[in-house]
């Protein structure tokens, strides 16, 4: 028997995605940071590791409100899988940039790994991507 129901994890992931979109559009990352436990770990391959929701919030706010990250407008998910037995979500997330009006969508893929903690929040996130693709 699984520790969590797939639907519970999926709802948490949906909420996480909505909070990320809101953060990108408003530059307020409060709701996104609230998707994590107080003692969560965030491993971002380019920037390093962050421990605790407050540190994650401080980092994401500073990073996403500064160019070039401030030009990210959305994070559409192209695919994901959920392991409800262990609480893992693995997804390909596109880092979509501002529309330049030339008919092309500028975006680069990111692999996001989330570990569910229960109660609608995650205790771990890891993002893997090549930052040179965004230059």
Write out the residue ranges for each language-model feature:
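Short, low-complexity N-terminal intrinsically disordered segments enriched in polar/charged residues
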Residues: 1-34, 38
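A solvent-exposed, acidic/Ser-Thr-rich amphipathic alpha-helical stretch
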Residues: 7, 29-89
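Short, mixed charged/polar active-site loops
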Residues: 49-50, 105-107
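A short, polar/proline- and glycine-enriched secondary-structure boundary/capping micro-motif
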Residues: 54, 101-104, 133-135
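Generic short beta-strand segments
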Residues: 92-98
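Short beta-strand edge/turn micro-motifs at domain boundaries
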Residues: 107-135
